[in-house]
Amino acid sequence: MRILLSNDDGVTAPGIQVLAAALREFAEVQVVAPDRNRSGSSNALTLESPLRTLTMPNGDIAVQQGTPTDCVYLGVNALMQPAPDIVVSGINAGPNLGDDVIYSGTVAAAMEGRHLGLPALAVSLNGHQHYATAAAITCRVLRALQREPLRTGKILNINVPDLPLDQIKGIRVTRCGSRHPADKVFCQQDPRGQNLYWIGPPGDKFDAGPDTDFAAVEQGYVAITPLQVDLTAYAAQDVVKTWLTKAGVGGEW
């Protein structure tokens, strides 16, 4: 198995390094990751400037000022030849639960892999301590994919409780929960009197029902949530058509 490994915390982050070491025990791994922390960069793709790479002494490749999406795009199309069999993103320092996935660079890296036609996993730890647990879970999932390929065409978003491996209760297939809208902005002034703004914390949980990723992780289970690139709200198509007709702007012009 040939694995392209990326993240949004940066090429030297502990999560990606622990995971790379674990994966190299049974797979060929190429790390292509941002040269710095790019958390919250979502699916941003660099189009207005060239990208440079730096190969680290251990063979990992850092994309200078690159986003997670840049890294996977370059990794699949230029830097890893032959092309990888799968894209893995993580281990993220902190969870990517509920609608956090909208902003997540970790999830975006996996989404880019899927968009380029490859199976993809995004792996996040609900904390900053037990990276070895998340690495072990990831290896189990990848070995399962080797034995029995999963042909859903979906991304697997994996969130792991920050616990020792022997305290993990199991794995649940979940849906994304949701949060209340975030509304905190912190304003400061620089020495010249100009305002500086800091984005505040995420909103509190709104939907953390028993079948959500929030609930599973809180109860000590690994949450695996299938995600997809296609954002079409199919159930709303007929509703929108009816509304356009009633509003007098539908149909042929």
Curated annotation (Swiss-Prot):
Membrane-spanning intervals of the chain: none
Main location (coarse class): cytoplasm
This protein's record includes keyword Cytoplasm: yes
Residues reported to bind a divalent metal cation: 8-9, 39, 92
Cofactor note: Binds 1 divalent metal cation per subunit.
Listed GO MF terms: 3'-nucleotidase activity; 5'-nucleotidase activity; exopolyphosphatase activity; metal ion binding; nucleotide binding
Required cofactor names: a divalent metal cation
InterPro entries xrefs: SurE, SurE-like_Pase/nucleotidase, SurE-like_sf
Localization (cell): Cytoplasm
Pfam families, sorted: SurE
GO cellular component, one term: cytoplasm
EC id: 3.1.3.5, 3.1.3.6, 3.6.1.11
Catalyzed reactions: a ribonucleoside 5'-phosphate + H2O = a ribonucleoside + phosphate; a ribonucleoside 3'-phosphate + H2O = a ribonucleoside + phosphate; [phosphate](n) + H2O = [phosphate](n-1) + phosphate + H(+)
Family, as annotated: Belongs to the SurE nucleotidase family.
Protein name listed in UniProt: 5'/3'-nucleotidase SurE
Organism listed in the record: Serratia proteamaculans (strain 568)
Lineage of the organism: Bacteria, Pseudomonadati, Pseudomonadota, Gammaproteobacteria, Enterobacterales
Gene: surE
